[in-house]
């Protein structure tokens, strides 16, 4: 969804991403490439981990737009890995709204695919989802 920012009048591009239990609502605003997550600097939020930051900026790097848009994120649920992957999906979806021609390169890189893997539920009679109690022959 494209909305004009009430204060500055700049276009704002929205995208929502989900992964495991994490949900990220992402806004792309024309700017200098800053990442803000839940009101904090993105580097601080993701503990200066280059893996998380690289995952998040990958869709922008694919299109060569690293320093052209600020990323504003509201992330909740899950852990840092799930949140980072959900932010990546949200950024990719927002970039598709920015320009429909962005879709094919993002699709080929797999950035528009929602990862369906989630934690498997625990079954009764087992210790965890699949871990059975130790077998005793006698």
UniProtKB/Swiss-Prot annotation:
What GO biological process, any one, is recorded here?
translation
Q: What is this protein called?
A: Small ribosomal subunit protein uS9
Q: Return the Basic and acidic residues bias intervals.
A: 100-118
UniProt entry keywords in alphabetical sequence: Ribonucleoprotein, Ribosomal protein
Looking up Pfam families in the UniProt record yields: Ribosomal_S9 (PF00380)
PANTHER family listed in its UniProt record: RIBOSOMAL PROTEIN S9, SMALL RIBOSOMAL SUBUNIT PROTEIN US9M
The similarity annotation says: Belongs to the universal ribosomal protein uS9 family.
Q: Please name the InterPro entries in this protein's record.
A: Ribosomal_Su5_D2-typ_SF, Ribosomal_uS9, Ribosomal_uS9_bac/plastid, Ribosomal_uS9_CS, Ribsml_uS5_D2-typ_fold_subgr
Q: Which cysteines are joined by disulfide bonds?
A: none
- Renumbered to this chain, the Basic residues biased-composition regions fall at 119-138
Any single GO CC term annotated in Swiss-Prot or TrEMBL for this entry:
cytosolic small ribosomal subunit
User: Can the keyword Ribonucleoprotein be found in this entry's annotation?
Assistant: yes
Q: According to the UniProt record, where is the region Disordered? A: 99-138
Give the GO molecular function terms: RNA binding; structural constituent of ribosome
